[in-house]
Regions:
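Amphipathic alpha-helical polymerization modules
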Residues: 1-261
């Protein structure tokens, strides 16, 4: 009986974790460039009471085994890197990656993090930065008193000054790609960190070597589907209730034994 309660408890723990993942997805439904997470489960070790094909008589073998499971556990949470819808903002510093790739963001410790959030701002020195002040890499500095800023699909940044004289190219934004984007580690602030599972970043010009193109004046919305998450929430709630009822049923069986034995 104790084993049954323990198995049901693992089910409660697993569904609680899944509910946390779903809640985080829904909380970030309006977060620019956010990628939804999903929880993956696996069954735990089995108690092998009889091996399949084992001897059950003088001349007979068991066609099946007798193996009792010991529950379930969450084995991973994984980001789903599907394209979010593009929202037009008409802000010259807003960028969206249409396709595969991430913006490169410099961290205070000198490392590079990666993001799909292209809502950039100008720092006091004219550099392109995130909402938290982290520098976009390669660094782009916009001179003062520009009349317009143009960012091409290939990442080329050019400006026109109020004095005229034609477009002046300032540099080119490059994006990074990974062989296994699901292996990136989320670190908050819309940032992801390279890991051994993700593989090394492959930096290239937008639109080249499989990299996505840039779209100026637009942002990528979260790829969270609210209806899908609500369905997942109901499924999780029902699974949690079923495991809770299993514990109650085992408790009733134990109570019956105590009262009648």
């Amino acid at each position: 009986m104790d084993a049954s309660m323990w198995i049901a408890k693992t089910g409660l723990d697993a569904q609680q974790t899944r509910m946390s993942v779903i809640s985080n997805n829904l909380a970030n439904v309006n977060t620019t460039g956010f990628k939804r997470d999903r929880a993956s489960f696996e069954d735990m070790l089995y108690q092998n009471l009889r091996q399949p094909g084992g001897q059950v008589g003088a001349d007979a073998q068991a066609p099946t085994g007798l193996m009792l499971g010991t529950g379930v556990r969450v084995v991973a949470t994984e980001k789903t890197h599907t394209q979010g819808s593009l929202v037009t903002t008409k802000n010259a510093l807003d960028l969206a990656v249409q396709g595969d790739g991430f913006f490169q963001i410099a961290q205070s410790d000198g490392t590079i993090a990666y993001s799909r959030d292209g809502s950039f701002k100008l720092s006091p020195t004219g550099q392109l930065v995130t909402a938290n002040g982290a520098l976009l890499q390669p660094a782009i500095t916009i001179p003062p008193n520009v009349a317009s800023i143009s960012i091409g699909q290939d990442g080329t940044v050019s400006v026109e000054t109020a004095a005229g004289g034609g477009a002046q190219v300032l540099g080119q934004i490059q994006i990074a790609r990974f062989s296994n984007s699901a292996g990136l580690q989320a670190i908050g602030q819309n940032l992801l960190k390279e890991t051994t599972a993700s593989g090394a970043a492959v930096v290239s010009q937008p639109g080249q070597a499989g990299a996505g193109k840039l779209m100026q004046g637009a942002l990528e919305a979260s790829n969270v589907n609210v209806v899908e998450e609500m369905v997942n929430m109901i499924e999780t709630q029902r699974a949690y209730e079923i495991n809770s009822k299993a514990i109650s049923a085992v408790d009733g069986m134990l109570r019956f034994l105590n009262n009648n034995m």
